[in-house]
């Protein structure tokens, strides 16, 4: 498989720069790979795609305001950090700019010294391990000094940082939002639950690798980034019961899919309480063990996310659906519109 097999022309003006005023007013393209039907609707009608007895699985990770601007304490040169993951205690892996000036022992000050960082290790590609010093609670300091790490294709300033969080965001740790969940409102979730659909939450902390382009021609040579996930016993029990009763597991977004499939692969299609790191790469040829349907946003050309959707619904049909979405002026990427995909079934 060649990376170019997942390429398509996307007019730049279709890349959504800001969220819509109303979360669930976004458009929704419903696609069925069996009948090859495509239906244009709006996201608040996703409830029509869900049946009593189904489970809707959402990722409740919360995006940290992980972009910090500071200065070196010796030269006062400007420094930018992007927090990637907490390695232990007050140590973090960060992406640093300009990295070449930040050798082991270098000190960086943020917010007039309210937060300082010392470089303890140099990594590849501008990565550094740093140890933070501060007074009080780290997350509170970060909330006051940090900025939301918006994706590189969004150039507008975000007026309300809550719009880059899902309404059910709870567990701190992501460098990017699980954007398929941005469309849900508390009212819509209430209606879905009232219909008899189980609402189930898991956690996968989204890393920046989610935006990393595939830089190799041969898809099989691409190395996926690792991300940390957690599924509780209560959630696993609910999902196993839904499956056993003939209900569908409907995932919200690729992060939920990757978590569920990682755990399902470990336990022969069953779900158990589990946490750990996953670098699962779902591409055409992959056999799904857990997920029956899902919603997702429209993704970047040649990305692993387009490959995942293609594994589920077939590459040619997915590219047809993307062509339709472009013709109908759907909005793309993080603040864009959504797609609902039902799984080809032989039942």
From Swiss-Prot:
NCBIfam families: PRK00147.1, queA. Its main location: cytoplasm. It is found in: Cytoplasm. Gene3D superfamilies: QueA-like. Transfers and isomerizes the ribose moiety from AdoMet to the 7-aminomethyl group of 7-deazaguanine (preQ1-tRNA) to give epoxyqueuosine (oQ-tRNA). InterPro entries: QueA, QueA_dom1, QueA_dom2, QueA_sf. It comes from Streptococcus thermophilus (strain ATCC BAA-250 / LMG 18311). One of its GO terms (biological process) is tRNA wobble guanine modification. One of its GO terms (cellular component) is cytoplasm. This is S-adenosylmethionine:tRNA ribosyltransferase-isomerase. Transmembrane segments: none annotated. GO terms for molecular function: S-adenosylmethionine:tRNA ribosyltransferase-isomerase activity. It catalyses: 7-aminomethyl-7-carbaguanosine(34) in tRNA + S-adenosyl-L-methionine = epoxyqueuosine(34) in tRNA + adenine + L-methionine + 2 H(+). The gene is queA. Keywords: Cytoplasm, Queuosine biosynthesis, S-adenosyl-L-methionine, Transferase. Pathway: tRNA modification; tRNA-queuosine biosynthesis. Belongs to the QueA family. Its EC number is 2.4.99.17. Monomer.
